[in-house]
Amino acid sequence: MNFEDIEDKDGVRFSWNVWPSSRLEATRTVVPISALYTPLKEREDLPPVMYEPVTCKGSSCKAILNPYCQVDVRGKMWICPFCLQRNPFPPHYHQDLSPNNLPPELLPKFTTIEYTLSRPAQIPPIFLYVVDTCVDEDELKALKETLVVSLSLLPPNALVGLITYGTMAMVHELAYADCPKAYVFRGSKDYQPKQIADMLGLNPSNRPIQPVRPGQPMPAPAASKFLMPVQACEFQLTNILEQLQRDPWPVEQDKRPLRCTGVALSVAVSLLETAFPNTGARIMLFSGGPATDGPGMVVGPELREPIRSHHDIDRDSVKHFKRASKFYEALSKRASVNGHAIDIYAGCLDQVGLLEMKSLTNATNGVMTISDSFMTAIFKQSFLRTLGKDEQGYLKMGFNATYDVLTTKELKISGVIGHVISANKKSSCVGETEIGIGQTSAWKVCSLTPKSTLATYFEVVTPAGQALTPNQSGLIQFVTHYQHSSGQYRLRVTTVSRVFQEGGHPSIAASFDQEAAAVLMARIAVFKAEIDDSPDVLRWLDRMLIRLCQKFADYRKEDPTSFQLSPNFSIYPQFMFHLRRSQFLQVFNNSPDETAFYRHVLNDSDVNNSLIMIQPTLMSYGFDSEPHPVLLDSVSIRPDVILLLDTFFHILIFHGETIAQWRKANYQEQEDYANFKELLEAPIGDAQELLEDRMPIPRYVVCDQGGSQARFLLSKLNPSTTHMSGSNYGAGPAGGQAIFTDDVSLQVFMEHLKRLAVGASTS
């Protein structure tokens, strides 16, 4: 079974691809039955289905017609495999229905299918820019240029608006062409949603928005002052952006600028929830520093007050942290309920408060990026890449989605880990065990990209001892309803089947997907760490690994030398070793904002990208061999090679000592050293390929052995050669570089694992 082929076809990877038949046996497999599903996975061979899906008439079922349904061609009926209800086909199916002429949704190759629904969205996508003006002139100039470029990438009918903030928050009127006009909110005041709606002149009544007739794109006349179609206001908005000035409020030498990020976001959320509830929209925040005033304040304006660190948070000695987090969480709930995504683009050397604001992006699946400045390529390319288009010219994003999961009676849903909120849908599919966001079978996802991946966890509920019919299968259906950027609603349906087997059957172990399992367990570990960042999470990971090895490894009791894992389990302990040392669980050397950013990206990434984050890839380039992957180990550092490290967040080219000396002596400029020039260029070309479709854009680092930036590589390597193991000071055996660390190496980690798994004494 090729797991990647299944992923290409259905966008799904399971931890186990044969399932234990009873609840007891399922708990003994340690890693829960779980799936990483990419709802908008790009597939070129999906047929355009321009009609409504056929749904089961069962009162609590509503499953959608799929290839696993039994079809009675003569009686024009189909049997739902989820609830066994007999359903008639709609009349328009009757004419052509035959065993040799089935509709696409019944063909085995279309276990994933996408319906284009007949009802279009009443309102086009909305993009509301929230722009920080408390930045230097050069920063503001670069930011304005990027924002003007972005307007040309939006759909012409998309609604667009602008809020700027510094000491005050200003909502700009786009319909007033004579001169710039804005509504001003005091940055130090905590406004209630009704106050904001009244001050903006929006109708606060809860009347549903009337359908839009062609030629009348403005559903709410009051809001049309602030949100207009790009094609109608591009000139006016470009003028406003180009004339934007730095916040005029004077800043004393020993103070930070007064920055009211909280008020600006509160106004943005209130504007959209009042005028466009339950509609596809994005609030895009461009933050050049931390909030220092008003609600959501992260740090005081006095420079002598440092911004909080992980150590401060652990000691519970942070003045603003809890209040700010609570404020942004309340905003995130209001935005996510209405389907509004919030993106945060940070352009600042210091922290901007991503830790406090993380709920805004985590609850709405917004974009989060970190860059040192708005002038950097990392910011510009990351932002403009989010507005990338497909071959038809539509934005590669879905809006205001709901994600439903159905299961057959043997399975129940434990929960989802990803950037979702619960839709509070109680159904017979909901299980007792809760992993992540549970107690529901549907979730709201405000924004989706073709790479957005959700982790869904299940439990087997069949009691032990209940007989199974031979080759009995369980079914799961993933249903994603979303607003396409073309203005249509679409429904993506994936139905998958897996076989049940008695506990202990060899096919269960053979079906283990160690890559998917590592990522699914990493998401649980990060979810636990978000609640309680303590060593308990590492202990839990270790316990799970030991139990998995005890269950599935071959060994003689109390004999560590006999320990052996089959190939489809053999790399799993290595993944866990690197996960324990990763920036997701080790906060040392990272700011709280960086930790929030790294965890945010992991919780939206597919298997391959997540694995690069957990266990980075390392390529070696030398004179005597073709470029080839090498161990992520200190023994891979040699003076005569170049290494290319990809950690997903960083792409690093590392020159060994000899290579660096030759490069500094400009040997590559001499004709006799053409092969050296080629060697220097090879990793640069490969790095460019990695940068091409990566989002967010990684930081690109070129360094030399012994240089300060070599720390990015050394921190990721397995320290098999340390200052304790080398015979000479600073050099390890076999030519590897000694790493100055007290961390245990993978070899020591594996020795301990073997001892604990086989039950031997560890003394």
UniProtKB/Swiss-Prot annotation:
The keyword Acetylation does not apply. Keywords: Cytoplasm, Cytoplasmic vesicle, Endoplasmic reticulum, ER-Golgi transport, Golgi apparatus, Membrane, Metal-binding, Protein transport, Transport, Zinc. Zn(2+) binds at C56, C61, C80, C83. GO terms for cellular component: COPII vesicle coat; endoplasmic reticulum exit site; endoplasmic reticulum membrane; Golgi membrane. GO terms for molecular function: GTPase activator activity; zinc ion binding. SUPFAM superfamilies: beta-sandwich domain of Sec23/24, C-terminal, gelsolin-like domain of Sec23/24, Helical domain of Sec23/24, vWA-like, Zn-finger domain of Sec23/24. It is found in: Cytoplasm; Cytoplasmic vesicle, COPII-coated vesicle membrane; Endoplasmic reticulum membrane; Golgi apparatus membrane. Signal peptide: none annotated. It is a peripheral membrane protein. One of its GO terms (biological process) is COPII-coated vesicle cargo loading. The COPII coat is composed of at least 5 proteins: the SEC23/24 complex, the SEC13/31 complex, and the protein SAR1. Component of the coat protein complex II (COPII) which promotes the formation of transport vesicles from the endoplasmic reticulum (ER). The coat has two main functions, the physical deformation of the endoplasmic reticulum membrane into vesicles and the selection of cargo molecules. PANTHER family: PROTEIN TRANSPORT PROTEIN SEC23. Belongs to the SEC23/SEC24 family. SEC23 subfamily. This is Protein transport protein SEC23.
